[in-house]
């Protein structure tokens, strides 16, 4: 199937090869007339090109990749190549797996068949999309892209699809390849060349791009790349092919010069994810890197927070270089060194290529500059870590195991005989006792779909994940299903405890990153620090990362996080109301000021909801609360005491207040009643068990006073008009996943509703961290911090100070947290409150003012 151009374009000559014709194409005997073709047509037209101006055809006649090499398909591909040669396009757009395999079979290889790739062929469209490569035996310039049908299935790829279509249209204006000449003469330098290069950088102080290869293990950095432009750079090998590259005295001189350059605050530096370079250099080699002025990952994230942020993606969008990241694992020494050279020069080019677009969005530029200023204290926290009390941690683990044993006894007493009769039980050893395994998918499937008789989803099949079990529990309220869910949650808690792995110095670390969420929130994951994993014989099996996500540490476990010694206090300060202030300002701007007035009066909306709920439960009119004067309402909410400890059912005594807070946040973001019920159930390990109807009452009462639904409607209108959300803090997000401006998908709407509150809260917290870090009065004569930050948790900071600095530190914390925002014309200063104690959990002593 082929369609030749009927309206030749005066400058562009593009051939488009799809995967294979679908039903609509076969019915009409015309390429690209189905839904995927319509998506392609829209994107081409947006770039000034019509499908009638292109050669349109397919790489295969069928969807099967398994029959690729049979005689019929081979004959078809010969015909295809002949047609392309005859048309002689300036560029060929390869859409999807079949097209890439037809143009570059050398890039494809056999692998083990999987559900995602049943043919057993690995065709790396994900890697090569956006790349400009020679194809069809080198005769034609090609651009690789996802097929429009794949994009429709995974619509999060629409942003990359748009970029790649634009690239193909641009490249169809000329036969020329856009490759740039780069001087890689110094990827395996001599000692003299290395010293000359480093000396010149030290003395002339050019802006440099930095990239390291290696890990913070027993070897450390294996090669260190430095570029002085997008075209020139040096790669300094240290450990190549299992051996040292330099003599000992030579390496000492090189490291000394490198350390001088890296610590020089007058030498501007850029990187792709500077946090890794800083951590490995400081942790493994005790080398400080100062004055990172740019970061290609952070800049790219600022412009397109929804897109992948790895260097492969960054290079594919901001340069015209083809995919190269697989060269990292090559066994060829020169290719491996060349890979590091590409990293540093491509990073340099990509970072500078973003400047024109960044200049077009001044607020985004300001936010990016702020994040670059924030990077040093983030790196400090990544390195510093926090002391962990191992005895307390063990006590928590023992308690969790005991509770899990209790759940197991309850489950086995009800299910064991039936499960045994159904022959679904397994055990590792014959000597092991029989037990129902709540980790086993097979056994949970039996429980849900055989024993309890639920009907599997027609679309997803017999799933057993947490949300599925919660959904069935919502329907049945079956007590044994609840116990199984509680056991699963307790296993998760136990796993969380086991992930709190310390480094040899007794401190736990995390890896904070500014670019891992779509809302500019700090992300936390396992630390970049590594320790050896030993086998039974005492030999090192491999090196593994320590630490974990510390933002999800439960309140119960926070007593394990302690200051360095008894001479220090642990402190925490968090924003009061946090995300709610942005919602309140939005509603006030829309003409619904109740929430903002409450916040300004020091009234917490969750406490107001508790009062309204009490009226409802007493069968009185909850609207009475809404009619109260603001001062009377403040007296009532101030008199509400939130209990501590556990109630008679084992629930947190504050569960009702927690439910009101969950209702506030979920309803602000267009969450539904069942979402609130599920959140509370999960957080409490099944102890707080509101029905959907009960959660709906909470929501109804909340809306009765604050009207958050009108903010949701306004956000939907903004998305329909612009497709973007601009936050007061400067962060901007374009929602590529919107299929139409006429309709906003509910999930996108919920994401957009939470975006600015989370971004603003994070921004204000980060402002406090920046104020703390750069305040000269917070430094000793040696440069050490009087008030140290250890942890960042969305709307809070925590750390330590010496007890002698307690009064001074309290005043300073309040000062650092005083930051103003203008949200839709309304000036807002989010108040902060906190305390200090002998652990993170016990920061209950009020901060002095």
Describe the residue ranges of each PLM region:
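Active-site-proximal helix-loop-helix substrate-binding element of RNase H-like nuclease domains
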Residues: 140-143, 149, 172-189, 222-225, ...
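Conserved catalytic core of nucleic-acid polymerases
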Residues: 376-379, 383, 455, 505, ...
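A polyanion-binding, active-site-adjacent surface
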Residues: 1-177
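Acidic beta-strand-to-loop metal/phosphate-binding motif
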Residues: 90-97, 209, 266-274, 572
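Conserved "right-hand" nucleotidyltransferase catalytic core of DNA-directed polymerases
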Residues: 170-244, 318, 326, 332-336, ...
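Short Gly/Ser/Thr- and Asp/Glu-enriched loop/turn motifs at secondary-structure junctions
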Residues: 51-52, 293-295, 392, 429-433, ...
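Polymerase palm active-site segment centered on the conserved acidic dipeptide of motif C
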Residues: 397-426, 430-431, 435-437, 698-715, ...
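Short, basic/hydrophobic alpha-helical segments
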Residues: 76, 80-88, 197-200, 248-267
């Amino acid at each position: 199937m082929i369609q030749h151009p009927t309206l030749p374009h005066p400058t562009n000559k593009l051939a488009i090869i799809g995967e294979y014709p679908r039903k609509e194409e076969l019915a009409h005997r015309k390429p690209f007339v189905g839904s995927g073709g319509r998506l392609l047509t829209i994107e081409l037209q947006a770039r000034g090109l019509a499908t009638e101006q292109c050669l349109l055809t397919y790489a295969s006649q069928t969807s099967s990749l398994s029959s690729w090499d049979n005689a019929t398909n081979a004959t078809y591909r010969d015909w295809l190549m002949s047609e392309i040669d005859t048309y002689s396009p300036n560029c060929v757009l390869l859409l999807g797996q079949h097209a890439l395999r037809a143009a570059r079979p050398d890039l494809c290889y056999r692998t083990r068949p999987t559900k995602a790739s049943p043919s057993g062929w690995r065709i790396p469209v994900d890697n090569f999309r956006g790349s400009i490569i020679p194809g069809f035996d080198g005769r034609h310039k090609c651009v690789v892209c996802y097929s429009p049908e794949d994009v429709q299935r995974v619509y999060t790829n629409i942003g990359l699809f748009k970029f790649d279509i634009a690239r193909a249209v641009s490249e169809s204006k000329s036969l020329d390849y856009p490759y740039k000449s780069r001087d890689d003469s110094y990827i395996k330098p001599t000692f003299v060349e290395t010293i000359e290069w480093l000396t010149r950088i030290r003395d002339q102080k050019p802006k440099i791009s930095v990239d390291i290869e290696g890990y913070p293990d027993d070897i450390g950095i294996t090669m260190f790349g430095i570029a002085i432009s997008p075209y020139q750079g040096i790669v300094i090998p240290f450990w190549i092919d299992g051996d040292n590259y330099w003599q000992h005295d030579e390496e000492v001189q090189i490291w000394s010069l490198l350390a001088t350059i890296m610590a020089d605050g007058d030498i501007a530096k850029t990187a792709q994810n500077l946090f890794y370079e800083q951590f490995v250099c400081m942790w493994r080699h005790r080398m400080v890197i100062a004055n990172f002025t740019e970061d290609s990952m952070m800049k790219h994230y600022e412009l397109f927070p929804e897109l992948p942020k790895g260097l492969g993606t960054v290079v594919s969008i901001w340069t015209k270089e083809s995919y190269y990241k697989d060269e990292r694992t090559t066994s060829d020494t020169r290719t491996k060194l060349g890979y590091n050279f590409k990293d540093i020069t491509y990073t340099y080019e990509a970072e500078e290529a973003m400047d024109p677009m960044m200049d077009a969005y001044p607020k985004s530029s300001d936010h990016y500059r702020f994040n670059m200023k924030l990077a040093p204290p983030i790196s400090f926290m990544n390195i510093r870590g926090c002391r962990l009390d191992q005895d307390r941690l063990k006590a928590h683990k023992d308690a969790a195991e005991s509770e899990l044993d209790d759940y197991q006894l309850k489950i086995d007493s009800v299910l064991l005989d039936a499960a045994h009769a159904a022959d679904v039980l397994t055990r590792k050893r014959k000597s092991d006792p029989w037990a129902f395994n709540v980790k086993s998918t097979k056994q949970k499937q039996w429980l849900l779909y055989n024993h309890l008789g639920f009907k599997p989803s027609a679309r997803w099949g017999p799933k057993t994940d947490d949300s599925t079990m919660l959904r069935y529990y919502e329907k049945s309220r079956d007590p044994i299903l609840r116990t199984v869910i509680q056991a699963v949650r307790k296993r998760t808690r136990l796993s969380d405890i086991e992930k709190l792995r310390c480094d040899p110095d007794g401190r736990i670390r995390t890896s904070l990153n500014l670019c891992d969420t779509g809302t500019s929130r700090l992300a936390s994951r396992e630390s970049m620090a590594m320790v050896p994993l030993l086998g039974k014989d005492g030999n090192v099996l491999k090196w593994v990362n320590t630490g974990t996500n510390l933002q999800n540490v439960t309140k119960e476990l926070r007593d394990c996080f302690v200051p360095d010694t008894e001479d220090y206090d642990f402190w925490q300060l968090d924003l009061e109301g946090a995300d709610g202030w942005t919602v309140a300002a939005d509603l006030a701007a829309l003409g619904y000021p109740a929430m903002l007035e409450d916040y300004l009066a020091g009234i917490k909306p969750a406490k107001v909801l508790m009062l309204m709920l009490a009226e409802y439960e007493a069968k009185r009119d909850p609207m009475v609360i809404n009619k109260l004067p603001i001062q009377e309402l403040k007296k009532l909410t101030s008199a509400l005491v939130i209990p501590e400890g556990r109630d008679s059912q084992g629930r947190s005594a504050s569960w009702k207040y927690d439910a009101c807070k969950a209702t506030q946040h979920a309803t602000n973001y267009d969450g539904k009643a069942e979402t609130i019920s599920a959140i509370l159930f999960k957080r409490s390990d099944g102890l707080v068990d509101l029905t959907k109807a009960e959660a709906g009452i909470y929501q109804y009462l909340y809306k009765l006073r604050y009207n958050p639904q009108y903010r949701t409607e306004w956000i939907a209108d903004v998305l329909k008009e612009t497709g973007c959300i601009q936050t007061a803090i400067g962060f901007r997000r374009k929602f590529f996943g919107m299929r139409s401006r006429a309709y906003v998908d509910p999930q996108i709407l919920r994401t957009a509703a939470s975006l600015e509150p989370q971004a603003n809260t994070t921004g204000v917290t980060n402002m406090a961290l920046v104020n703390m870090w750069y305040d000269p009065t917070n430094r000793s004569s040696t440069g050490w911090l009087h008030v140290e930050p250890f942890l960042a948790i969305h709307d809070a900071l925590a750390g330590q100070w010496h007890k002698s600095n307690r009064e001074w530190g309290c005043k300073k914390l309040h000062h650092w947290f005083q930051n103003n925002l203008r949200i839709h014309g309304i000036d807002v200063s989010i108040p902060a409150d906190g305390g200090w104690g002998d652990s993170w959990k016990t920061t209950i002593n009020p901060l002095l003012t």
